[in-house]
A protein has these predicted regions:
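Helical "substrate-binding/catalytic lid" subdomain
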Residues: 18-141
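Acidic-glycine-rich active-site phosphate/pyrophosphate-binding loop
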Residues: 1-18, 66-72
């Protein structure tokens, strides 16, 4: 009941620091989802597909996920208003990679996402939402 005003659910992952690791695991998943969503849209655009139809079809199958449903349509409309700032996401990816290194883990997909978001932030787009990653693709911008 203590957290009712600020949370719909409360989860216990273990001792101090475990919740932070759970958040980093979530951010690792989002990194893969956002890079995949970006490349799916770029590929579909290059192939001349109806991107709205593609979002509908992919969203009703195995590729369905929150980012696709919520950010996909916004990306098509050019709406990069942040739900979560890219610069803050980059910070989280760096924390996740630092923690992974301490555990002797290699996370190559997360490393790639970190590089992509670092480039986005370096070009002055850190205040866009995470879905703004699509703006970094030359084909998306120039097609």
């Amino acid at each position: 009941d203590l957290f009712a005003p600020i949370a719909t659910s409360v989860n216990y992952f273990g001792p101090a620091g475990s919740g932070q690791h759970a958040k980093m695991a979530n951010q690792i998943m989002i990194a893969g989802t956002m890079t995949g969503l970006t490349e799916m849209l770029v590929y579909g655009k290059a192939a001349g597909l109806d991107l709205n139809e593609m979002l509908t079809v992919v969203g009703s199958g195995a590729g369905a996920n929150w980012s696709l449903s919520n950010y996909g349509p916004r990306m098509l409309q050019g709406d990069y208003t942040p739900g979560f700032f890219a610069k803050h996401f980059l910070k989280d990816l760096r924390i996740a990679l630092d923690e992974a290194k301490k555990m002797h883990l290699q996370l190559p997909a997360t490393q790639l996402a970190e590089q992509l978001y670092a480039n986005m932030v370096a070009t002055g787009k850190g205040d866009l939402g995470t879905q703004g990653l699509v703006t970094m693709n030359d084909h998306w911008r120039n097609a």
